[in-house]
Amino acid sequence: MSVCFAYVVTPDRENAEQMAHSLLTDRLIACANIIEGMTSIYRWDGAIQRDTETILIVKTRQQRLPEVEAAIKKM
């Protein structure tokens, strides 16, 4: 059994917790870690932007990753 991680950027803790709870309820993941206050710096529309985001890291089996990705995209 191979374990893998998915790194998900969310706007805030509430959103990350809702996603984690849903994925756990559906038994798609084994565990979730939430990291608040991540600073992201990126280029958008020709300018450098800076935002604070919350990171959700989920742990799952490799064969479940496509299901996890699909569920996250629906949220």
Question: Can you name each region flagged by the protein language model?
Answer:
Residues 1-75:
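Positively charged, small/polar-rich N-terminal and surface patches that mediate targeting and assembly
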